[in-house]
Amino acid sequence: MHRALIVVLGFALAGIGGLGAYFLPVFQTAAKSTTISDGLPNLNPIEPPAQPFTVLLLGSDDDSKFIPDRLNTQSMILLRVDPGTRQATMLSIPRDLWVPIPSHGMGKISWGYQFGGAEGAIRVVESTFNVHIDDYVWIGLNGLVKVIDMLGGVNVQVTNPVMDDYYPSDLNSDQSPYGYHRVAVLPGATHMDGVEALQYVRSRHGDLRGDFARSERQQQLLLAIKATASHLNLADLPTLASAFNGEIKTTIGLDRLRAIVSIAGNFDGPNIHRVVLVPPYTSEGFAAGQSVVFPDWNRIRPLVSQSFP
C-alpha cells in the first residue's frame, strides 16, 4: 500500500514541546520519491488537532555496523502535546533502561527497535510506561546533520564541557565505522553546524553524568532547532524535503502534519516541560554482565501518570 512518509527533524512543531523545528517532510511512494507542489502553502485550511497526542522520537546510529531498521536507538524521547491546555511534555528515556522486552525477556529498552523496528520500539515503550503512542519519528545521524546545516546551524549555550577521546568516526561511508577521534566542546555561547551539533548530543564519554547528561543535551539541541526554525513556513518545505532519502521516517501523514503546524505557535517556554529520568528515578548497575539503568517504578509511575495521563 502506497503511503506518504513525512520525515522530520527532532519534533518539529516550530514551538511545540520545545523539541525543535517544523516537521520536515519527504514524500515517498514505495521506494520512489515524489515532489511537493509549488502550491503547497495554498492548500485548503485544515482543522487543527483538538485532542492530546503522543509521539515517540527515535534517534539511531545508521552506519555500516548495523543492519538497516535493526539498530539500537541512541535517543528515545516521548512527547505529549495537549492543544487544549497548550501544554507539552517531553520525557527522555535512558537507552539502557532495564525493562521487559515483549517476546524477548529482560533487556535494554533500546533493543526494542533492534528486535522489531519502530513497531517494536513503540510496543516496549507503551508496555513499559503504560502510555498510548499515536505516531513515531525516527532520524539517523546524517538526517540530523542535514537538517541543521539546511537551517544554517544552531546557537547553543554550552554549560558543561564535552571532552571525548572515543567519539565514533562513523558518519561518512568512506570512514571505518569502528574508528574514533577526539571531540571537544567548550562552555559558552556556540554556533554549531550539523556535524558539531551531532557531536554535542551524541558524545557520551568524559561526562561524569553519562547518558543522563546526553539526554539533557539532546533536549537542549531540539529547543535550539525550534528557535532557529521558527521563521520557516510551508513554502519552505519543498526545498527542505528534497534533501532527505530515508534518513528520517515517520507515520505522520501530510494532512496531520499541516494540522500540527497550525497550532505550533501556541507553545512556548513555560508551557514546555522537560523530564529526564535521573536518580532517584533511576540507578545504574549491572545485569546479564552489562551496564544498565534500573528504574524505580514507585517514583516513575506517578510522574508518568501525571505527565502522560
Model-derived segments and spans:
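Non-catalytic, solvent-exposed segments at the cell envelope interface
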Residues: 1-309
